[in-house]
């Protein structure tokens, strides 16, 4: 599924070279639920961006479903992202003027899926997160937890190989956070591969496996 070997990434900040990743190596198997945990500045966001094909490493190799990611152009990476990866963000990233179902539909429009099929798949995705009854509502008419459910439905609608969630409970209260984590557990039980980025130990421990990152290095892989 995900095979990363000795990844390194350096950024220039003014005149200073900052090593965001330092020969990081990890393997994530199909259908796993894995958390990547680390403090601010640990390199977890850089690792997430590379796993999500939003950035490329300076050195090392990354294979996603057997594809050598570093060999692809930016346009090809965009196609891989849209086909293989569903993203869930801390800030939901919903378009305010679009209804819940229209937000969920967007990735399918990009894929040029026929309208009738789009409608069926959008409905099914919203049902999976328990929000079909709010399909016509705008984001401003939904609670934070409901907006995150819409974001999860949007991630699911393309049937991706990988769900990549970046601090998905970061803006939510404890009760709503539990509800969102329950959805991730249900999705994992249904066979989805989930990688969850977090700084919260309590959230990280809910995954089947926790990968700890510090100063750009994988320091521990805990069951």
Predicted regions and their residues:
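ABC family nucleotide-binding domain
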Residues: 2-214
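Generic detector of intrinsically disordered, low-complexity segments in short proteins
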Residues: 43, 222-223
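Conserved switch/coupling elements of ABC/ABC-like ATPase nucleotide-binding domains
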Residues: 215-221
């Amino acid at each position: 599924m995900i095979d990363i070997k000795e990844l390194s990434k350096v950024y220039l900040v003014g005149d200073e070279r900052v090593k965001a990743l330092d020969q990081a190596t990890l393997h994530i198997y199909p259908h796993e639920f894995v958390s990547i945990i680390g403090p601010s500045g640990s390199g977890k966001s850089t690792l997430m961006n590379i796993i999500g094909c939003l950035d490329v490493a300076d050195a090392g190799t990354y294979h996603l479903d057997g594809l050598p990611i570093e060999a692809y152009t930016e346009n090809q990476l965009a196609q891989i992202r849209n086909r293989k990866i569903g993203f869930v963000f801390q800030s939901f990233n919903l378009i305010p003027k679009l209804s819940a179902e229209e937000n969920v539909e967007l990735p399918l429009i990009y894929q040029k899926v026929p309208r009738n099929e789009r409608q069926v798949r959008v409905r099914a995705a919203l049902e999976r997160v328990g929000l079909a009854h709010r399909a016509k509502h705008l984001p401003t008419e939904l609670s934070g937890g409901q907006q995150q459910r819409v974001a999860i439905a949007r991630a699911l609608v393309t049937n991706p190989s990988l769900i990549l969630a970046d601090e998905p409970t970061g803006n939510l209260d404890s009760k709503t956070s539990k509800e969102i984590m329950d959805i991730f557990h249900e999705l994992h039980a249904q066979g989805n591969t989930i990688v969850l980025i977090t700084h919260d130990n309590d959230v990280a421990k809910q995954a089947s496996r926790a990968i700890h990152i510090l100063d750009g290095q994988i320091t521990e892989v805990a069951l």
